[in-house]
Amino acid sequence: EFPASQKSNDAGEVTSWFVSKWGPFLSNKMMRNILGQTKSGFNIREIMDNKKILLINLSKGKTGELNAKLLGMIFVMKFQAAAMSRADTAEDDRQDFCLFVDEFQNFSTESFESILSEARKYRLNLVLANQFMTQLTDKIREAILGNVGTIMSGRLGVTDAELMEKAFAPVFNAEDLHAMPNYSAIATVMMFDMPTSPFTMKLLPPMGESSNELMERMKVYASSKYGRPREDVEREIEARLADTSSKPAAPAMAT
């Protein structure tokens, strides 16, 4: 939204403000190709309803910190909107869908608060992972502890152990959380709409071996089914930009 303090009848000033905010994203070829397409190659609602798997790599090393944050926020809001659109489906017919968000503090917005408090009835389940509670704002932290049914914690640092102690008290204290051995955790889960007493659990160490060959084959298959040739995308975007730049500028509004 154009800031009230900068409102102007001059269309040129509005355009300049917009370009200054979006310029860093649109000047990045990868981001321009992602955001500049007129139609997405996949439908979030269809993915949720048909129990498909969508993997989104938002590595800062590949996309850049600012770009990763923007894309992460966009996807979170799209999943929220898709979940809310399930209002047109009978509650018993809604399929459970799990949204796993690693390092979610990078994408935490008010959408998370809304999802935590409202999206449960639309069968959107969140699995949120991060390293330190201090990475979260007080508002997000309170929303999590107040709405999440299952909380699982491995070994924590001193500060986080003190923050999380109340979730597992009086069975476990901060010292227990700080002294957890490897591949162990303390958890409390929701059963029959009631939280269980906190308990300890053993976690499985990494199992099996990854297959780079299989991974590459899956990437090729997914790209061929849902993607488009980069050259076609860039050609369409450049054509639209050229068409826009050739049009005369809108006259300034009279004051």
Where are these regions (language model features)?
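P-loop NTPase motor domains
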Residues: 1-124, 140, 177-181, 187-195, ...
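Conserved NTP-handling cores and scaffolds of large molecular machines
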Residues: 22-29, 78-87, 123, 140, ...
